[in-house]
Amino acid sequence: MSKLTVKTEGDTHVIFTRRFAASPESVYRAHTDPELVQKWLLGPEGWTMPVCINEAKPGGKFRYEWTNGKGGGFHITGEYLELEPYSRIVHVERMFLPDPTPDNHIETRFDADGPGTLMTMRMTLPDSQTRAAMLATGMERGMEASYVRLEGIL
């Protein structure tokens, strides 16, 4: 429905927003149901997620592993801190490239927006250097490719 927008705030925050032509319930479920996550959260074309563990409950763990089929890959692990069904998810994650990145604290909101959903994801990183390094990876392109795929299954 709309492309991902990205803005920074202060030294440690990144705020992503995107609108979806689907209900908050559907978009939330796509972020918490491992069978759905494994279908859309793939990044650029050619990547797959052979491992998708997602225990969407407070204290629950998740682990996503991606591969590009050419020997490259990475994984993310994390823990859910808070879940408000269909409206809000708070979690902490770290990426392994192969060494772990510092923890990234993420709050994602799913707000009704007319006939669709406005998703707002606020990341809080430990310092400006970590934020700059994260943004320099081009993650925005991979996120948007995933969200385009998500729209196709909502």
PLM features per residue range, with description:
Residues 1-46:
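Hydrophobic ligand-binding cavity/cleft-lining segments
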Residues 8-10, 54-56, 70-74, 99-102, ...:
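A generic structural micro-feature
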Residues 11-17, 49, 61, 75, ...:
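Intrinsic-disorder/low-complexity, polar/charged segments enriched in Ser/Thr/Lys/Arg/Asp/Glu/Gln
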Residues 13, 90-141:
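Beta-strand/loop substructures that line and gate deep hydrophobic ligand-binding cavities in soluble
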Residues 15-21, 55, 65, 79, ...:
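Generic structural detector for well-ordered beta-strands
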Residues 24-25, 55-57, 81-88, 109-118:
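A short, structured loop/turn motif at beta-sheet edges
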Residues 27-28, 37, 62-64, 80, ...:
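Hydrophobic pocket/interface hotspot
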Residues 48-92:
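Glycine-rich portal/gate segments that line the openings of hydrophobic small-molecule binding cavities
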